[in-house]
C-alpha cells in the first residue's frame, strides 16, 4: 500500500468554528509557532465547546482548587486561524507542538462537576484499605517507600519463579528490604474482586466475560499496580489484553479525577479547617499509552469508550477521519500478525490527548488538560525534543502514574531509541510550576520518588535485550514486578514445507556483546562465505549453484556484508543483489527478478524489510541466516521460501538452512530451537554444529 509522505492532515468537514486551527494531530513539519509558555498558542486541539473552556489559562490542579472561589480572571484571547480546504482532500497532520502543549483553561463543565458527583460514586471516592489505588498511591508509608527505593537502586530484589499449566513462565520480583513476600498472587478469574469504579463494573464484565488462563495470571498484578512485562502477546490474546488494560487505565483516571473533585468540594465546604489533602501530581496527565500505529490508537480508544460508555464524544468524527482507514484488501494473503499491525492506518507519527468529564470524552485535548496521552514514540519525541531548546517540554510527563507500552515488538522495528528517550524523561521534576498547588501534591512526588510508584506495563510478542533492559532499569515499582514468557516448542518444528528440511546451527565464539559483530563477520567470511564462493566458482552449471538467500537481521551488518560482496577479492566472481528497508521499490523488484532468474547467485535480505513487506522470495535453493530473526514467526516464513517452486522443492530442502549464533543470541535461539534444546546448544563442549531435520 502506498503511504503518504509526511504526516497527513487537514481539517474534517464538520468544522463550524474559526477557532479551529488547520493543523491536526500527526504533522512532521517544522514547529514554528510561538513559545508555548510566553504566548497563547493557536488552538488546534479543541472542539466547539472550547469557547467556554478556554478562559483562565490556569493549570489543572490550581483550577480545581479555585473553582469554588468564583474566579473571574480571563486568559488572553485566542488567535483565530482560517480553515483551509485543499480541494476537499483530507490529510492527517500533527499540530504544531505548542498546540498540544497549551496550558489548560477552565471549563464550566468542570465547575458543574464540583457540585454534581454521581450518587453511585460517592462510596468509592473514600479511601479504602482494600483498594490498590489507595494502598499503592495514598497509604504507603514514607519509610516503606524509601527502603524499597534504596533496595531497587542497589539492585537488591528477591524473586519467585513458576511455570503455569498453560506453559507460561512467571518470575515475580520485589525489592529486597528484608520484609515482604515475593510469592505469586492467585489468578484473577473475574472482576468480582477488582475494585473498579461502580460505573465500570457492568461494562468490564461485558468486555471480558471470561478471562483466558494468561489473562487470569496477569490481572492481579495489573490491577495491583505492579510492573508487568508480558512476553507472550499474539493475535489471539491481543484484543483481550487491550480491553483489560483499557479497563485498568480508565478506572485509574476516573478514581483520580473523582477523588480530586470530592476533595475540592470538601475544601470549599470546610474553608476554616486545616485539611491536608494529598491527592494530585504536578500536572494533570496520569496515563501514557505508547502504540505503534494510528489504527492501534483507534482500537485502544474503542476499548476505552466501550468501558467508559460516555454520553458524548467530542471530536469523534475528526478522530475517525484522521486516525482510521479500512484494511487493504490486497493483504488478505499476508500473515495474520502483519494484518493486525499494518491493517488500517499504519502511520507511526501521531499523538492524542484524551480528557474525561463525568459524561464525556474529549479527543484532541491539549496535553496539560488531558487525563490520558496516546502516542507513537516518534510522535511523542517530536514534541519533546524540538530543535529550538526553548520549546522543548516534558513536564506533561512528570505525573504519569500508569505507562502502557503495547505491541513493543512492533515498536522495536521502528526506532527503540525513541522509547529510551521517553522513558528517561518520565516522572522528572517539572522545570516550571504550571500553576501547581503544591499543598495538594503527594509527598512522594515532592521527594522525587514517582518513578518508584509509577506502574509500567509492556506487552510484546517476544522479549529482547532492549526490553529486558527496560525491565531492569525502568521497572522500579516498590510494589514489585513480574515477567511472563512462554515455554517455546521451537520454530524449527513448525516449518510449513511438505518435505523435511535440513536446519543447521553453527556456533561461534564471542567474548562480549560489543565484539559480537566483528566475531560474526569473521566467522561468516572465513567459514560460510568461503565455502559458498568455492561452490559457485567451481561449478560448471552456474544455474545449479545460484539461489542463496542470506538473511541479515541488523542493518549495520547488512551494510558491512554488502560492502564486502561489492569490494572484496573473495567475491569478485559472485553476482549478488541486496535489498533492505531503505532500498527503492523499483530496485527491489529488479533485484528479486534477477535472483529468481539466476542472474544473481546471492540475495542479501534484511529482517526489517521482511517485517514491513513480508515478501515471498522466489528462486531460493538454500538459506544462510547471518543471524537469527528476533521474531520466531519469520523463521518459518523465510524457510518456506524453499518450497515456493514446487519443481525444485526437494532440491531446495536438501540445500536447507544454515544459521549462525553465539551465546549472546540465547533469547533468539530459544524461540527458534525451543526451550528444552537451547541450554545444551549454548553449553555443548563437544562441538559447535547442531543439525535438525
UniProtKB/Swiss-Prot annotation:
InterPro entries: P-loop_NTPase (IPR027417), UTP25 (IPR010678), UTP25_C (IPR053939), UTP25_NTPase-like (IPR053940)
SUPFAM superfamilies, per database record: P-loop containing nucleoside triphosphate hydrolases (SSF52540)
Basic and acidic residues compositional bias, start-end: 84-93
Region annotated Disordered, chain positions: 1-133
Role summary: DEAD-box RNA helicase-like protein required for pre-18S rRNA processing, specifically at sites A0, A1, and A2.
Assembly, per entry: Component of the ribosomal small subunit (SSU) processome composed of at least 40 protein subunits and snoRNA U3.
GO molecular function, one term: U3 snoRNA binding
Highest taxon listed in the record's lineage: Eukaryota
UniProt KW Heme keyword: no
Matching Gene3D superfamilies: P-loop containing nucleotide triphosphate hydrolases (3.40.50.300)
Protein's organism: Aspergillus clavatus (strain ATCC 1007 / CBS 513.65 / DSM 816 / NCTC 3887 / NRRL 1 / QM 1276 / 107)
Lineage: Eukaryota, Fungi, Dikarya, Ascomycota, Pezizomycotina
Gene Ontology terms describing biological process: maturation of SSU-rRNA from tricistronic rRNA transcript (SSU-rRNA, 5.8S rRNA, LSU-rRNA)
GO cellular component terms, A-Z: nucleolus; small-subunit processome
Entry's family note: Belongs to the UTP25 family.
Keywords: Nucleus, Ribonucleoprotein, Ribosome biogenesis, rRNA processing
Pfam families documented for this protein: Utp25_C, UTP25_NTPase-like
Locations listed in the record: Nucleus, Nucleolus
Keyword Nucleus: yes
Protein name according to UniProt: U3 small nucleolar RNA-associated protein 25
Acidic residues biased stretches: 15-54, 97-131
